[in-house]
Amino acid sequence: MLTKGVRALAWSPRRYITLDAEAAKPVVAKRRRMTEFTDKLNKGPSFEDFLTGKAAQMTLDPLEEARQNAEESKKLPAWLKVPIPKGKNFHKLKEDVRDLKLSTVCEEAKCPNIGECWGGNKGSATATIMLLGDTCTRGCRFCSVKTNRTPAKPDPKEPENTAEAISRWGLGYVVLTMVDRDDLPDGGAHHLAETVQRIKQKAPHILVETLAGDFRGNLEMVDVMARSGLDVYAHNVETVEALTPHVRDRRATYQQSLSVLKRAKQTVPTLVTKTSIMLGMGETDEQVLQTMKDLRAVDCDVVTFGQYMRPTRRHMKVVEYVKPEKFDYWKEKALELGFLYCASGPLVRSSYKAGEAYIENVLRNRRQA
């Protein structure tokens, strides 16, 4: 009996362990299938593709996707095709950005002008530094910047590293931008303001433009930025009011953007205020004209117009490739309405250097007056 009992005790654990392992297999397999399904879903067609009936035509094959992207690029109008970035200055600036662990909107947003801006000589090369990391808390449908609800904490060395990089490049005008940081109490305003101040300490002659977020409508943070010592306060409305809910993250509203531009000018009247509008998203001429009037009503000084370019097939589609002649038309209208300056063209972006050269002259003349 004792031997039998011992055998039973020795056998029972093995039996239960075997049963537990077998029972776990379906669970592990199910989790694996769910993970694979989630990955496929993330890489698959967008909701817009289902609405337009094109989801069935899509594939998850990376090679096929690359082929389709190549075919799509062939359809671009000639005026939207640019040469591949290259040159000594381009690679030197790129190395500096890497060495100092900085992010640039030029790369993150896949700007088509990166070769022209980074490839210029020492006096004209321009890079738009993106502060507060490379991950945004918002998900606008036109933007290719990475998104996450809880990005990494801001790098406390970033303001100093940014100022050091800019002093290396010997620029006379620099653009700072930021990802939206709704996870931070101040939206990142003090971090951005500190960067401006560090730059001014190292090189007082440099003119600084900041392309800031809306800080979720917290106008006190707009005051912090406006008083930081910057020269140009830029904040983009991006599109017309009617398309804003479709184009931008739900936390970004048209009226909120107007209030940011208005408050910046009220806080420091000598600031140049600036905004940018993308065309080709389905807007009408009447809507664009009204947007320009709304901007002038809040005393916005500078406006730029550029063609919306779809970063990837997961972003919203281009409704229209606007012809260069139309961009010329909007430039004329902007000047008629009283804007200080307007850069308008298919490849123009909010920090495009052509506009900076003009604004730089205006600001330096104001300093001398």
UniProtKB/Swiss-Prot annotation:
<dbReference type="GO" id="GO:0051539">
    <property type="term" value="F:4 iron, 4 sulfur cluster binding"/>
</dbReference>
<comment type="pathway">
    <text>Protein modification; protein lipoylation via endogenous pathway; protein N(6)-(lipoyl)lysine from octanoyl-[acyl-carrier-protein]: step 2/2.</text>
</comment>
<dbReference type="InterPro" id="IPR031691">
    <property type="entry name" value="LIAS_N"/>
</dbReference>
<feature type="binding site">
    <location>
        <position position="136"/>
    </location>
    <ligand>
        <name>[4Fe-4S] cluster 2</name>
    </ligand>
</feature>
<keyword id="KW-0809">Transit peptide</keyword>
<feature type="binding site">
    <location>
        <position position="143"/>
    </location>
    <ligand>
        <name>[4Fe-4S] cluster 2</name>
    </ligand>
</feature>
<dbReference type="GO" id="GO:0046872">
    <property type="term" value="F:metal ion binding"/>
</dbReference>
<dbReference type="InterPro" id="IPR006638">
    <property type="entry name" value="Elp3/MiaA/NifB-like_rSAM"/>
</dbReference>
<keyword id="KW-0808">Transferase</keyword>
<feature type="domain" description="Radical SAM core">
    <location>
        <begin position="121"/>
        <end position="340"/>
    </location>
</feature>
<dbReference type="Pfam" id="PF16881">
    <property type="entry name" value="LIAS_N"/>
</dbReference>
<dbReference type="GO" id="GO:0009107">
    <property type="term" value="P:lipoate biosynthetic process"/>
</dbReference>
<feature type="binding site">
    <location>
        <position position="117"/>
    </location>
    <ligand>
        <name>[4Fe-4S] cluster 1</name>
    </ligand>
</feature>
<feature type="binding site">
    <location>
        <position position="140"/>
    </location>
    <ligand>
        <name>[4Fe-4S] cluster 2</name>
    </ligand>
</feature>
<dbReference type="Pfam" id="PF04055">
    <property type="entry name" value="Radical_SAM"/>
</dbReference>
<keyword id="KW-0479">Metal-binding</keyword>
<feature type="binding site">
    <location>
        <position position="111"/>
    </location>
    <ligand>
        <name>[4Fe-4S] cluster 1</name>
    </ligand>
</feature>
<dbReference type="GO" id="GO:0016992">
    <property type="term" value="F:lipoate synthase activity"/>
</dbReference>
<dbReference type="InterPro" id="IPR003698">
    <property type="entry name" value="Lipoyl_synth"/>
</dbReference>
<dbReference type="InterPro" id="IPR007197">
    <property type="entry name" value="rSAM"/>
</dbReference>
<feature type="binding site">
    <location>
        <position position="106"/>
    </location>
    <ligand>
        <name>[4Fe-4S] cluster 1</name>
    </ligand>
</feature>
<keyword id="KW-0411">Iron-sulfur</keyword>
<keyword id="KW-0496">Mitochondrion</keyword>
<keyword id="KW-0408">Iron</keyword>
<feature type="transit peptide" description="Mitochondrion">
    <location>
        <begin position="1"/>
        <end position="32"/>
    </location>
</feature>
<comment type="similarity">
    <text>Belongs to the radical SAM superfamily. Lipoyl synthase family.</text>
</comment>
<dbReference type="InterPro" id="IPR013785">
    <property type="entry name" value="Aldolase_TIM"/>
</dbReference>
<keyword id="KW-0949">S-adenosyl-L-methionine</keyword>
<dbReference type="GO" id="GO:0005739">
    <property type="term" value="C:mitochondrion"/>
</dbReference>
<keyword id="KW-0004">4Fe-4S</keyword>
<feature type="binding site">
    <location>
        <position position="351"/>
    </location>
    <ligand>
        <name>[4Fe-4S] cluster 1</name>
    </ligand>
</feature>
<protein>
    <recommendedName>
        <fullName>Lipoyl synthase, mitochondrial</fullName>
        <ecNumber>2.8.1.8</ecNumber>
    </recommendedName>
</protein>
